[in-house]
Swiss-Prot record:
The gene is vit-1. It is found in: Secreted. Residues 1310-1479 form the VWFD domain. Disruption phenotype: Simultaneous RNAi-mediated knockdown of vitellogenins vit-1, vit-2, vit-3, vit-4 and vit-5 increases life span, causes accumulation of neutral lipid and an increase in lgg-1 foci in the proximal intestine; however, does not affect fertility or pharyngeal pumping rates. Expression of transcription factors pha-4 and daf-16 are increased. This is Vitellogenin-1. Keywords: Disulfide bond, Glycoprotein, Secreted, Signal, Storage protein. InterPro entries: Lipid_transp_b-sht_shell (IPR015819), Lipovitellin_superhlx_dom (IPR011030), Vitellinogen_b-sht_N (IPR015816), Vitellinogen_open_b-sht (IPR015255), Vitellogenin/Apolipophorin (IPR050733), Vitellogenin_N (IPR001747), VWF_type-D (IPR001846). Residues 1505-1531 are annotated as: Disordered. It comes from Caenorhabditis elegans.
Amino acid sequence: MRSIIIASIVALAIAFSPAFERTFEPKIDYHYKFDGLVLSGLPTASSELSQSRFSARVRIQAVDDRHIHLQLVNIHMAASHLPESEQIPSLNSMEQRELSEEYKQMLKLPLRAQLRNGLIAELQFDKEDAEWSKNMKRAVVNMISFNPIAPRNEIEKIESSYDKEEQSEENTSFFTNEKTLEGDCQVAYTVIREQKKTIITKSINFDKCTERSEIAYGLRYSSECPECEKDTVLIRPQTVYTYILENEELKESEVRSLYTVNVNGQEVMKTETRSKLVLEENHSIKSHIEKVNGEKESIIYSSRWEQLVEDFFKNGDKAEFAPFEKFPLDKKMHLIKTITEQIQEVENNIPETSHFLARLVRIFRTTSTSQLKEIHETLYVKADKKIQSLMEHALAIAGTKNTIQHILVHIENEDIVPLEAAQLLKSIQETPFPSQTIAEALIKFAESRVSKNNQVVRQSAWLAAGSVVRGIVDYKNIRPLVREDKRELKEKFLRVFMQQYKDAETTYEKILALKSIGNAGLDISVNQLNEIIVDKRQLLPVRKEAIDALRLLKDTMPRKIQKVLLPIYKNRQYEPEIRMLALWRMMHTRPEESLLVQVVSQMEKETNQQVAALTHQMIRHFAKSTNPCYQRVAIVCSKVLSFTRYQPQEQMIASSYAQLPLFLQNSFSGAQFDFAAIFEKNSFLLKDLHASLDAVFGGNWNKYFAQIGFSQQHMDKYVQMALEKLESIEKESTTVVRGRRIQTGITLLKELALKMNIRARPANYNEKDAFAMVYLRYKDMDYAILPVDTQLIEKLIEKYISNGKVQFSEIRRLLNQEHEFETHHAAYFYEAIRKFPTTLGLPLIVSGKIPTVFSAEGQFSLGLEETELRLTVEARPSVAATHVYEMRMFTPLFEQGVKSVQSVRAYTPIKIQAVVGMKRNFEIVYKVVVPENQKSIISLTTRPVVFLRFPGFSKFEYIEAEERTVVVPQWQQKTQEIEKVFNFLGLEVSTRGNILNQHTLENWLLAEQDFEVSVENKYRPAEFTARLTVGQLEKTELSQIKYNKIFEKEFELEQENTESRREYFTKMVKSIQKEQGYKSVVSLRLEAPRDYTMNTEVTTVCDKQVRMCQWEVEIRRSPILEETKEWTLRSQLLVVRPEMPSSLRQLHDQPHREVQLSLTSTWGSQKKSEVTVNAQLQQSKEQKKYERNMDRHFNGMPEYELLIKAARLNQINAVAEYKLTRETEQVLARYFDLVKAYNYWTVSSRPENNENDRVVVQLTVEPMSRQYVNITMQSPIERVELKNVQVPRVYLPSIAQRSVKHLLNEASGSVCKVQKNQIRTFDDVLYNTPLTTCYSLIAKDCSEEPTFAVLSKKTEKNSEEMIIKVIRGEQEIVAQLQNEEIRVKVDGKKILSEDYSAHQIERLGESDIVIELPEGEVRFDGYTIKTQLPSYSRKNQLCGLCGNNDDESTNEFYTSDNTETKDIEEFHRSYLLKNEECEAEEERLSEKKNYRKYDERKYESEEYSFEETYDYEQENTNKKQKNQRSQKKSDLVEKTQIKEFSHRICFSVEPVAECRRRGYEAVEQQQRKVRFTCLPRHSSEARRLVKEARQGTVQLDDHKISFVHSVQVPVACVAY
């Protein structure tokens, strides 16, 4: 029975419509009053807004229950600039605006609507109705479309009504999807029912729409920033409907919509629409509304007009409809002529010039091909150069199919010069209307004759084609909610680009093809690019470019990019550059934690140090990034980095990555500078260098907003070869002799290779493959490439070098030039447009652009006369740029909106002269001339503006907008007024206006500023001259240097023989003064108008060995400001360094080992300040104690290594006596107070009464870690101490250190060490092999033209002493230890130590020599051989027991015939030179236990095991003997050991070795007795010592011994 009842009710529900559908009764004429208001302005109270009001009477006639007819009558418009009010202002309070009869008739055309469940289902318009008119009528119909019943299935409805009879009378709230004028979106209903009155409220959720008539252009350059999207929504629409029904009849309907533009979360612009529909009367129909029979359409805003315009822009005359054909050509030409005449009226560019450019762009976008041809023939041809250039650039900026085709035609006809054509193609790259036809036109042009004949044009065309294709296929679609299938288009263009790649014959052409693919950002290109990357037959620059071509896919398919690049990064078979670039690209895909864990794992076990170093730096910098778009990645990187035990090695030349993020706190704006440099062992030049700028403004992320990069392959080898060709040709006889000697040396090395069956390692590169390029990237698009290949270099050499002689005539012809130039350039730095509908049926357009015009004209001359090169440039540059950010409504009826305008103008006429001459002295003269009677101007203007334009569009004339600047008091308070005029060196400088004092992006958009700086020269030309003169090195006497006083102790009284030290010092100085000295003078003179001068002269006097130097500085300057006398500075600095000790014993016995410094300085004008500083660079007590403990009998390398450490100077003592002016003293006091405040927690001070005008300073660097500094300063009134201030690791000078050149070699080179039977290779592989009395080849240049070889053998069986033989070119050097002294033979003849330098041999200490190689050096002390080569030396062309120096530790064992083996015995035997002079010791060679390769994670402690030394000395010695480029994966550290008890704390008196706390464990330990001293736990000294002991070692020699305890001390550690 129940089911029958339910079925009956369902039938009734279907038969009858709900009550609200009968709002309009049939045959009744309803008259509603419609009022619409548009407000545009700033979101601030009491500011003026542009307001336009639309009023009409709406007639609605219900044809039947489901159809109505609607017509607008009595239409009126009014508009004014008024403050905002809550109610719609009356028509009388606003200025009346007349509508043309054509527009009125259009608006009066009727429409027919079908209602379904209260909603407008379909619309029919008159066939003559225009799109803009239809949309305005949609806005009216939209106000009567509502359905207050919640959607649910029929059974639920009936059961609900069956249970609750009065359900319809209750208040309800629900969500549903509904079509409105603004789209198909989720809406929220609230229904409140009162007695006879029902109030219905409806709001729209724009985040949940399936369809919206939204269009966007120019957004393809931004990258995704997920972290920014939630808080930085640029445009936020809000719409609320309110319906009031009485007795089921619609009495009133109101719609309010608010659209705001937000920057950094703050509203900066708004547009508001208000619509109200009020029932005035209803009566029976007296006159019927005409029936319409147009096509059925939806209520959603129609963007057909926008689509027609877009189709015209993209396809030109081939479009189906010409939307601008009603705009007559003669009126366009008249407007263009008017604009060009206005531009010509002003000599220089002004902000209006950029506005004129924007107007030209708008006009050109409406033109057809025939119209452009007419404009060209009528206006362009007759215009001057500036107007022609502006018109060309305006056509390129317009970026429509017609304008682009017009430009390409004229480039093909060679009407535009190639350089200008390339600039225009760069502008075309940024067209906001990319299309298939434009891309095809560019590709066709790139294959044309003109392009093939000019590489600059061809390059620009292909890059532009790629960028346009990106715009076509980019996922950031023109219509965001519409997804089109573009696979066919992608495949088509990919085939074109890949065919270009396949047809390429040179490296440059292949790279150009790949850059075109990269600019296109085709996701389907990943597989082809991957094939190129992994194909080792391809040249390395091509494979690297293939990786770079994946950059635009980081947002669309990050996982796919990671899937391609992660295996490449982890595969050690690939080249290091490829792996590092793969990692770099992969990191920009913002990888997840699971992937980063794999990267860190690979880093920890990485054998290539360049790859490991770059990986660590990259992850570390990403972890510290403050870029809001990388916050998730930063957190993950921090996490994975905290768990790694990898410690990067210290290298001077290593691949590196750095970031400099500059972001505003709590805002999503800022910039980030990225820097990446990739080095490789086979090149002394950088392999890759990238510097980029990322910009984030209000959450809009422009990745690679600008980038410049350099990449090269084998170019260093080719450059080296080319430079050799440029060397001067020596005399014929010398050349012949030298050539014979070199050939003899090469023959000697080749004979050695023949004896040992060494196969030459040919270079793995072809000179013709050498390639380098510099590229420029803008907005993530490759913009320009400058290739450098062998052909270019050879052409230059052929042109300027002939028969080995420089062709000076060609060089003079190149350098003697004189030109006049005039250039003009125009561009949009960006243009972005977004359009979406409003509830008034009007399109709202939010756009931004920066039209910029730059001009420069002048003369340029370059001349070479004898030894003088002269450059003169006279230029008059001017630039004008305007940033326009606007929000506007546009219809033919009117145009209204709000915009923020920022304009910059600069005009700076200038003349520059530069002269470089080399006569008696080297001289550079640089002169800047400000012309007379000319004014340089730099101005800045910002203002928010509201505007109105009636009508909005005219076919016959340009309608000027009614603008009004909005002044907001709260923003004007953030500016300051400036008005100042002063005279500077004869120039009148004027600054006037107001400028912001709080700089944020929103302040720049909303505040009114008008600031100008002008510089005027009213008299003769003002010349500013800088003259730098570098004098020749002259001989001089050193007796003029007086230095007899040594530094006296100030802080400590130490028992030492002061008299003997003074005598030693005086004797040393007198000895130096007897030698020949050298003097050089460098002067700099600055001259300015009004007889202003400044002279600086620096005189340097030094002895030949630079042991004693004196610098004198004298500066004279004309008086300025309130000075009445000449300002002068006279300073003299004298430095004397001690003699360089050659052994530890000599260091210990040397009375004077300090560096003496003396500075006297006087400066000032009327009042003089004087300072005298005596300083001494010396050793602290701790360092001296360390040196005394080292005083043992060492020889050879161990002695020298310890000597370097023992001779370090780690303390500076200085005494300054001064007489300062009060102002100077106050400034210095403020700075000192600032230092004390900054180090508040580490500084202590106490008052003292010391000598006046005297300061004593002591600075001590902790000598072990070199990361902590103690500073003590004693002033006349106090004593200040700063303890344990942490600083970056400090380099401590050593008086025993060799030259800077050798220091750099040690820090940056590759080292191989041979000791006993143990070898550590160049690539840090440690293994044992038995050395015999037969020569073994340690290292050799195994190229086809070898330069050196190093061999070694034992002097006797079971002896640790060795003999070394070095074959270096034409020389054979043999050395061995005899009677505790190294004996050397060169070509079989003994040489004395004083003759070493003539043979490029140096003696270190008493038994250590250094033999220089063509690249690098060999050190030998009789027991150990240390071969050191530059890190880039002979990669894969070295052979011998030291390996191949290729930075890979997995492929060390290549035999002499270049075959890889795992058998160390086989490897060793291949490099064994057997002859009758030696016994092969076959038993030792065959014993397998004599061969062993150590695990790379272990640290072998067998090196330099001297039992008689202290543990600390041994540990430091061992670490120094380690190859400095190894990772030091295991290490021992010295610390003071602490033992804690209940009431006391005990400290070890001497440091105790232990493993590093994290990641290491002891593998071998020994017992050691250690002395301890104890202190009460509660004592302050105990707490202080605990703190110091945790940071390093503590000196406790003067404390009482409490007990001796046996502890376990590690001998070696291993990373676990």
